[in-house]
Amino acid sequence: MFDVNSRLRINIIKTILFNFSFFPLRDAIKFPVLIWGKFKIASYKGKIETLVKPHWGMLKLEISDPVRSLSANSYLDLKGKLVIGANVLIHRGMNIEIDKEATLILEDNVSIGDNNTIITKDNIRIGAATSVGNNTTFMDSDFHYVINTQTGIVKTANKSINIGINNWIGGNCIIKKGAITPKGTILAGPFSMISKNYVGKIPENCLLAGCPAKVVVENIRRVKNIDTEKLISEWFRNHDEPFLYKGDIESFCLPN
C-alpha cells in the first residue's frame, strides 16, 4: 500500500550521502541540502558551490504539495557545476541534467515548481526571487546542429540562459537557449516560449505571452507579500471593483 507519510519526510540517508559527497566536512555537517522522498542521483562527478556561507537547509529538494505530484520522483545528473544561493526550493518530479562543462546557477529565494526539467549544456542562471511554475522546461541547447544549405554556415547549438531577478515563469512554458529577461518579467503560461534577449528591448515589469512570447502588458508585477495578498483577498470578498493602492509599490509587493 502507498505510504503517504513516507513521501513527506526528509530522506535522511540521501540527505547525508548528498551533503558528504558534494561538500567538505566542515560544510557537510551543516546539511546545506535537505532531500525529501525518493531522489535519484545519477552522477557525483560534478561540484556544488554556494553564493552565501553554507548553512542548514539552504537548498530543499523534492519538497512539494502532495496533492500535485505525490508519486513523482526527481533526478539529478550532476557532471558540471551547480551554484546555489540561500532558501532555494526545488519541488518534486524535477529532472536536472548539468553537463561536464556546464553551470546551473540558482540565486537566493528561487522556487521551482513540480515536474520541471532543466538541461544545461552551457550556462543557465535563474535570478534571485524568481518563481517557476509546474511542468516548465529550460534547455540551453538544441542538442543537434543544422546547416544553411545556401551559405554552408553552421551555428552553435548551445547558448546561455539568463532569467532576471524577481521573474515569474508560469506553468507549462519553455525557456530555450539564448533567453535573457529583465527584472520583474512575467511569462504567462501555459505554452509560452522565449528564446531571445529581451533586455534593453522591453521595459522591466512586463508580462510576456505567446510562442514566441511578446509583450502583452507593461507596468505589471507579481504581489508576493502574504499580508498584502490577504488584504486584497478580503477586499474582493466584499467588492467587485478592482483594488486600488496608492502607497509604496516595493513594500506592497515584496515578501514579508
Regions inferred by a protein language model and the residue ranges of each:
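Conserved interaction-surface patches within small, structured recognition/assembly domains
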Residues: T117, C173-I174
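A short acidic, glycine-rich active-site loop
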Residues: I153-I161
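Extended serine/threonine-enriched, polar tracts that run as long, contiguous segments within proteins
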Residues: I169, I175-G178
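Conserved beta-strand->loop/alpha-helix structural units within folded catalytic cores of enzymes
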Residues: G170-G171, K183-G184, G189
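Short helix-loop boundary/capping segments
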Residues: F143-T149
